[in-house]
Amino acid sequence: MMTQKPRTVICVGDIHGNISKLNKLWLNLQSDIQNSDFSSALVIFLGDYCDRGPETRKVIDFLISLPEKHPDQTHVFLAGNHDFAFAGFLGLLPRPSDGSEFKETWKEYSKSEEREGWYKGEGFENMHLQSRRWAGKIRVQFDYSAYGVLYNGSIYDAASTFESYGVPHGSSDLIKAVPESHKKFLTNMVWVHKEDDVCIETEEGLTHCKLIAVHAGLETKNNVEEQLKLLRDKDTSIPRIQPLTGRKTVWGIPQELDDKKTIVVSGHHGKLHIDGLRLIIDEGGGYTDTPLAAIVLPSKKIIRDTDNFSN
């Protein structure tokens, strides 16, 4: 009796406006993966398509084109924290389901408003905290050396996103400049994606697992189902959504998933980290001298834009 070959799953790290890296990575994936496996693959983009790099607009054009170019693939586009903030600036986030206003998200962090230079232009009254931070202008430079980042301009390094659409940083003209197809893409991004049967090579051999893909990760000490519900419901009443923005709190695998054969795959952290079933695929972090990486399952092979595959 023939066993069915496991489906190829490709998880792509944070792109951050780097269209040239994305083009090269995609070509390398096509070159390295058997054609039949590539053409039917599940491709999960782990979020953060915008900011830092110069070509956010072209990156989103590329992503939008994939379903037509590769109709037998399945494409999943996770929202990263940068994309969340971008969408909020454009007025695309769902309203808080508890009936509160977005201004309620400002209160806990109001002492940082002047220091971080939150956006105060047209429409700010109805923006989520993260969107005001995204479009603002920092009064001073912040050295987040733990993340290898020296922020200039917006705390999100968002100036390049504005400029890719032909408008200056912090301008409300961005709302009109972003095409409707891009707004639809940003609206439809999912905050979490689950698969019930994904194969991965482990010390025990080929193992069938569940998979949860979320931009930053799941809080290791909080109830998993409550977190998944928040993400499925797109709860925008929260100022900082840890599964999209967290660092140490979402680095590992939640304790309750330890013995449940569940892969948790993320980007966000500016590192490539593979520890059992915890996969963090963000080797590049959006910076010029670092690669854009993807992981291919079940083999766990890492493919980068910098790889040179001979034909």
From Swiss-Prot:
One of its GO terms (molecular function) is protein tyrosine phosphatase activity. A divalent metal cation 2 binds at residues 48, 81, 215, 268. Binds 2 divalent metal cations per subunit. The keyword Hydrolase applies. Keywords: Cytoplasm, Hydrolase, Metal-binding, Protein phosphatase. Its cofactor is a divalent metal cation. It is found in: Cytoplasm, Cytosol. This is Tyrosine-protein phosphatase At3g09960.
